[in-house]
Amino acid sequence: MTPKVIINPAAGQGAAGKAWPGIAARLRAALGEIDISQTAQAGEETALARQALAAGHNHFIAVGGDGTMNGVLNGIMGEDGT
């Protein structure tokens, strides 16, 4: 399955969104196909990660700040902490 990339373009006062085109190009060059989801509101990373996990994704890349990484990890971990 293709890696799931979850990006928060608002992270770093918009720096993540500005850097995204270059990051995406480098990810595609290194990994080939990637499946991208962008957050539209704060805290959406967790739900996006849970949806991706349910769809069978098992490789995740978080693009943003520490809150983005935390949200993605919370989505992957599951409610029972596993």
Q: Residues of each region from the PLM?
A:
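Short Gly/Thr/Asp-enriched flexible loops that form oxyanion-binding sites at enzyme active sites
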Residues: T68-G81
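Secondary-structure boundary/capping residues
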Residues: I36, G81-T82
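ATP/NTP phosphate-donor binding region
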Residues: M1-F60, N70
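Active-site acidic Asp-centered loop
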Residues: V63-G64
